[in-house]
Amino acid sequence: MENIMKNPIRRLRSGAAAFITLSCLTGPVWAADSIHVRGTVASVEGSAVTIKTNGGKDIGLTIGDDWRIAGVVPASLSDVKKGVFIGTANVQDSSGNRALEVVVFPEKMRGTGEGDYGWDLKPKSSMTNANVEQTVESVDGSTVTLKYKGGEKTVTIAPSTPIVTFADATKDDVKPGAKVFISGTPNPDGTMLTKGFLAVGKDGTTPPM
């Protein structure tokens, strides 16, 4: 299915509450058997949610104890500075590695998904979650050196690159019309997600990852 794709990334740390603050999301938030869903909340009936994917498919989920929810709100290039921990989907072109989007992680989420691995936002894209070691400003944006366990990478962030951060959210933020990014575990026929991580855009924000 378009925009729904397996990705070999890490497992959520479990927690007791269904709807939790970001302080409980400090461990890796991706599950090894997860798929990615990008789309819009089509309907909500109690805990049952239907997502219309960007590819036009419907996929369902029931929000319960196996789900973790985070809000997504705008950030800016000025937030990408030395010492912060970020995640960026990026692609390599003739000029180097170019950011497709950037997530500035709150300090309490430092270390989330650390590393550099394949991603499915664009063909041949990667996700790099790492500490910002150096930034170089220019009229074309900012070039950042990212350091993670076992390696480092230099990525250019253009002024037009979507930049966001995570905020606290609850089930009430998952409402019709909200944009979402989901890393979830599918049932055998792929029509339902049974557990995972749901990032919901707040105040009209689209999760860019």
Please place each PLM-identified region on the residue numbering.
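Short, flexible, surface-exposed loop segments at domain boundaries
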Residues: 2-9, 22, 26-209
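Sec-dependent N-terminal signal peptides
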Residues: 11-20
